[in-house]
Amino acid sequence: MSGACSLSLLSDRVYNKNKMTEKKVKHVGLLHRISSCFTKSSFASCSCDERGQAIDEGAGQILAALEEAGKEGYIVGGCVRDLAMGKVPHDWDITTSARPEEMLSIAALRGWKAIDGGGRRFGTVIIVLGGENYEVTTFRSERYGSDAHRPSEVSFAKTLKEDLMRRDFTVNAMAMDRSGRLYDEFGGLSDIERKRLRTVGDAGERFSEDALRLFRACRFAAQLDFMADSSLVEGMESAFPRVSGLSLERVRQEMDRLLVSKHAARGMDLLVRSGLARCSCRIKEKGAYMEVPILPELSHLVGLPQQKEFHKYDAWYHTLAVLEAVSPEPLLRWAALLHDVAKGMPGIRAIRKGRLTDYGHDKKGAEMARDILTRYRRSPAFTEEVVWLVENHMRFHFFANSPEADAEKWVRQLARDHVFASSEAMAESFLHLKDLCKADIIGCGRPLSATEGHEAFGNYMAELSRRMPVTSKELHYPKDVPAILAPHVAEGMNNLLFRVQNGDLDNAEEALHEAALRFKKRHGM
C-alpha cells in the first residue's frame, strides 16, 4: 500500500526558491516544509510526519474536518505527484468517503463557503478557503459508453482503491492522508523514479474509455519529461477511432498545454510517432459536425534526411530541437513546430548539384501553417503572426548573413504594405523572428555562440522598425500640420507618411512642417 520504493530526487527536481517571487506569500512556508524534507531524503523515505507537514494549510483543514466527522479523506492525484517530484502543487484535490451532502454539512458547520460542483452526478464539492478553491470529490467509479470523453455512468465507491483504479496514469493515482501516510497501489513512485509514464491497468482500456487521455499522455510526457512506457505506446492505437468523437476545443487545450511545456519535444514526438497526429477530432458548426485533422502534416518529417553540411539531424529531430530552443510562448512554439513543415513536399524537395534542397519551403510552409491554425480556430491575429514568422524565417537568415544587403528596404516595404498595426508591433515581430531563427541555428546542432550575429541583426531590425512609422499617427508632426493640410488632411497625411516610409523625408517636426506647406502650395490651398 504505502510507497516502499526509494525515490532519488535529482537536484534539478528540487524546487528553486528564486522562482517563488510570483507565488503568494502563504506558499513560502509550504515551500520550506517541502524543501526541509527533500534536503534530508527522498519523498518515499521521508517519515509520515515530514510528508504530512508538506500538505497545504487549507487542504489540511479539510482533511482534519473529515477526520473529525468520521470520514476518510486524502489528498490525491497531481498534488501528490508534484510533492513526490519536489514541486509545490498548483491545485490540491481531495478524495473522501463522505457523500456530497455530508461534505456540504461539514462545510456549513465551520462557516466555509461551499459550491456544489456537480455533487449529484460527479460527487464534487468545491470548498473555498483563504481565497483558494479545493475540489473535494466522493470516492467514485466510472463506466464509459459511446461518448469519447465523458463517462456514461458515475457511481459512488466504497474504498479509496476503487477510486484510484479509475485514474489515468500511475503517477496520478497516488493518495496521502493528513498524517503523511502514502497510498501507492499502482507503482506511481517507482514510475517517478524511473521517469516513466504508465497507465493504471491496461493501456488500451484506459484510452478507449476516454480518448482525451491519449493527448494527456503526450502532455504529461512533455510536462514531466517522462518516457512513455512501451505498454502505453502499444495501447494507444486501439483507441484512435475514438478520437473522432473528441471536440476540437478539448484537443486544442491539451495541445496548447503540451506546446508550452519545458520538454514539449518529448510530448510532440509521442504524438507524431504513435500516429495520433494523423487522427481527427471534430467541431460542431451550424448544427453539423466537421472533421478536424490533428496534425498529419508533421508525419512526413520523421526520418526525412537533410543536407549534412547544414543539418546535424533529420527534419523531425531538427523541428523538435528548435521547438525546445525557443521560449515557451504559444506564438513561438507554434512557429517553431511549423517553420519547416513544407520540407520534403512535392515541388519543394529536390536534388540540385548533388545536394538536398527545399527551396520555397518557407512560403509553402506559411500556407500550410495558415491552414492548420485556421482549422484549429485560432484567432486571425495569432494565425497571421505565426504565418509571418514561418514565411520570413529564411529571409531573416539571408539578411543576417549578408551585411551588404539593404535590410532597411525590408522594413520600409513592410511599413508601406501595412503588414503591422504599428511600428512597435513590427519591432516585436522582428524580435520574435530573431528568437525563432536563433533556435533554428541551435536546432541544426550548432552552439549558442553561432547565434550572436542573428541576435545583433534582430535587435537592429527592431530598432529600425520602431523608427519607421506604419500609420500617420506615428508621424512626429507639429500641431499645426492638420490645419495646414485642410481640407485634404487624410490625403496630405498619407503623402507625408509615404515619403517618410520611402526615405525621402525625415520623421521630424521641422521636415514634416515644411513638407506640409509644400503639399498645400502644390494643391493650391
Q: What do these predicted regions represent?
A:
Residues 5, 9-525:
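Catalytic cores of the polymerase beta-like nucleotidyltransferase superfamily
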